[in-house]
Amino acid sequence: MRCEVPLPLLGLLLCVVGAAAQGGQEEFAVEISGTTVTITCPSSGDDVKWKPDPKMVVNNKYIIQNHDSSPLTVSCTAGDEEHTMYLNAKVCANCEELDTFTVVGIIAADLLITLGVLILVYYFSKNKKGQSRAAAGSRPRAQKMRRPPPVPNPDYEPIRKGQRDVYAGLEHRGF
């Protein structure tokens, strides 16, 4: 019972300290367009050195053309500061990025169209219930004719009223 109050307080303290520790770190800027990945170093300056391949640098930005979606560790050094990033970007040539508003709009439009079709089907089927027209080439139907009962199968012998055999009738037997 004594640990109920300190545990939430300890959790809050850990969140505040963790956020303060992460707040000082600068982040890489990553842009993905088709199969091209452009990475900008968080350190500003003209003497930024990139690893693993310093040849892929244009205007202090590390540009990977035709990236094959394989994981890659990229690091940049500006002066005495070194920043390292693990890049695991999935890229494709014909991909399009959709924002949340577009996806929600597509789903809402689909639901509205479906609801409209349901309402149309309901109203059109409601009006057709009582209407029944005879087709052009059909003849009027007569009342259902009664058929005679089917002929009994000659393979089975009918049960006679006076017969008292074991299988002559249905009897209740207790097991």
UniProtKB/Swiss-Prot annotation:
One of the record's GO molecular function terms: transmembrane signaling receptor activity
Leader sequence segment: 1-21
GO biological process, one term: cell surface receptor signaling pathway
Residue span of region Disordered: 133-163
Keyword Chloroplast attributed: no
Protein localization: Cell membrane
Membrane topology: Single-pass type I membrane protein
4Fe-4S as UniProt keyword: no
InterPro entries: CD3_esu/gsu/dsu, Ig-like_fold, Phos_immunorcpt_sig_ITAM
Full protein name: T-cell surface glycoprotein CD3 epsilon chain
Organism: Gallus gallus (Chicken)
Lineage: Eukaryota, Metazoa, Chordata, Craniata, Vertebrata
